[in-house]
């Protein structure tokens, strides 16, 4: 499964809202605590580290997709 699909599938478990790459976390009902918990899962799944500074810059689903794609190379 590609990174984008995996992330959207995982995020879909946290909300009933439809999730797309352009979805803002604030609009789909995922708060900062949910995001921190999810990032921990992402770090383990993709064997990467996401810094607190990088986490603060994540506002929409595509932000995290791009970040993980960059770190997975």
UniProtKB/Swiss-Prot annotation:
InterPro entries: ACP, ACP-like_sf, PP-bd_ACP. GO terms for biological process: lipid A biosynthetic process. Keywords: Fatty acid biosynthesis, Fatty acid metabolism, Lipid biosynthesis, Lipid metabolism, Phosphopantetheine, Phosphoprotein. Residues 1-72 form the Carrier domain. The keyword Phosphoprotein applies. The modification O-(pantetheine 4'-phosphoryl)serine is found at residue 32. One of its GO terms (molecular function) is acyl binding. 4'-phosphopantetheine is transferred from CoA to a specific serine of the apo-ACP-like protein. PROSITE patterns: CARRIER. One of its GO terms (cellular component) is membrane. Gene3D superfamilies: ACP-like (1.10.1200.10). Pathway: Lipid metabolism; fatty acid biosynthesis. Carrier of the growing fatty acid chain in fatty acid biosynthesis. This is Acyl carrier protein homolog. It comes from Mycoplasmopsis pulmonis (strain UAB CTIP).
């Amino acid at each position: 499964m590609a990174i984008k699909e995996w992330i959207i599938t995982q995020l879909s478990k946290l909300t009933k809202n439809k999730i797309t790459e352009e979805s803002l976390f604030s609009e789909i009902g995922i708060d900062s605590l949910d995001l921190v918990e999810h990032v921990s899962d992402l770090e383990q799944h993709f064997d990467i580290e996401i810094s607190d500074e990088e986490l603060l810059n994540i506002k929409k689903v595509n932000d995290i997709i791009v970040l993980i794609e960059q770190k997975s190379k």
